[in-house]
Amino acid sequence: DFWLKPSAVNHGQTINGYWMEQSRGKFGITQLEAFGPYRMPRPLWAYGLNEHRQNNSTPDGSRARYRMERDIDSLWKNDKGDLKDNYDATLRVYAGYDETGVWQEFGEMKFNSRDEIPAEWCNPNPDMPRWVPTRYVDWTSWKAGQMMWGLSSIRQGENSGTITHELGHFAFRIGDNNNNPYVQPYRRVGSGTWDMMDRGSFNGPGGPHMRWVVPPIAGASMPAGLMIRNRLVNGFITENDLITVSREGLGSSGPVIARITARAVEPLPGEYAGMVVRLDGAEPHDRTPATDPATDPLSPGTPRFNYYSLEVVQRIGYDSFCPDNGVLLALNTDEEGRNGGPNQFNCFNWVIDAHPEDINMVDYVKPNGEKVMRTVADYRQLNDALFHAGLNSGSEFEYTDVHNRLHFYVLDIHRNDQEIISYTVGVRSLDSEITRVPVIVTAPKPALKISGEGTVEFTLSGDDICRLSAEVQGKGWEVKLFNELAAPADGKKVTLPVYLKASPGCSKKATVTLTAVSESDPDKISRAVAMVRL
């Protein structure tokens, strides 16, 4: 019931709900039959200590080497017969914690050092070490380390909310896209909180350090949606849902402009689920110079990406616990593969971070009061990665890839009657000066009367991406733009507000000039002048 039936306990969120949202109703989990419980023939540690260099940490000196799946499947078969082939998947939930949710919380977060772990958290054999090694670091408490790690077989502890993540492995054969954030040299994460196949599987109330709660209603209970690349691989969206262009094509077509709807819902009429820009042309397709991850933690590793994607994240549906609304820009590979260098990892999504600087936030506080900061490799470094539209938005509205000769723009934001967000985005080739129809700026006539402060609305027509600037002539008058970019397209006119404010003692009249300069061809300039008066 917890996994499939919406209730007050699971806050209305189910495994089926997640997959139905991501797949637009194509894939779901509508039936789950429970068997057991069964008493395992061996203690928990006999299964949990068989991984991550823990095998020799058993209380009785034996070597841990057992798999829970074999024993539980045998008990199930003896009880009910051989039913395994009757089901698409077998989920084994054991009474205990999933080590992924407790190794840090009941290890280095709870104890200052491995030598300070008290007896109740230690190996029952006092002659054995108090600690055990674990997946990412050298030690955790024995009690935490004896737990099993969730696997795509599919195996989960009672605290684990990452069943959706493991199903991604099991049903669709998609690998992890995550780094090891705990070892040096540190390397930046791939997609972080923005995709369920990375640490977005940890999203939910309380975040990553609340994944020990039973039942799993806190961290990891609301995983992020899937990015464009993974939805394409799974067959959840098709090329028809996207606007797809290529680097070479942009060189001959001029800028491309499109509206993209938030990924948690169906694209609105006339809009797309995302934009794809393929890196085609002469080899190498990805022309990013190789950098050494050993000295540059922000390096994406081996230049091997096939295309850019742009999509919109809105904090609704299963994206509710994403940290921001905005445009998600990423590099993607068609095939999975490791990204090279020290601490390399399987990386097929590489989010472009609008704020690549250190986020400078505390991860946790040790028992002795010492603050532990999030490292450059922590997935939450990408919490502020999204691009926004307009000036003073708290983020960037454009991104230039000089090496791959592309310029991306976040041009405007829109909300419909249901408050669904969509963005107008654009892309152009840095090697093209083509403008399909030059932009023309038109000013309102006659002179406008302004009472202290107000708005002058100019009109833009044409088919191009342009950069705007505004100025005012008149004593004591100020002028501001909320957006530095505009992109009329498809014969549609765009209304551009220019905001004015008059100070006490200002001149009675002023002139406002709006200038639009083509991004592709800076020689194409249009301007218009409006008169205002008090």
Q: Predicted segment positions?
A:
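Residue-level signal for secondary-structure boundary sites
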Residues: 100, 205, 318, 337, ...
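Generic detector of solvent-exposed, compositionally biased contiguous segments
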Residues: 14-81, 163-167, 171, 243-297, ...
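Propeptide-to-catalytic entry region of secreted or membrane-anchored zinc metalloproteases
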Residues: 1-163, 171-184, 190, 213, ...
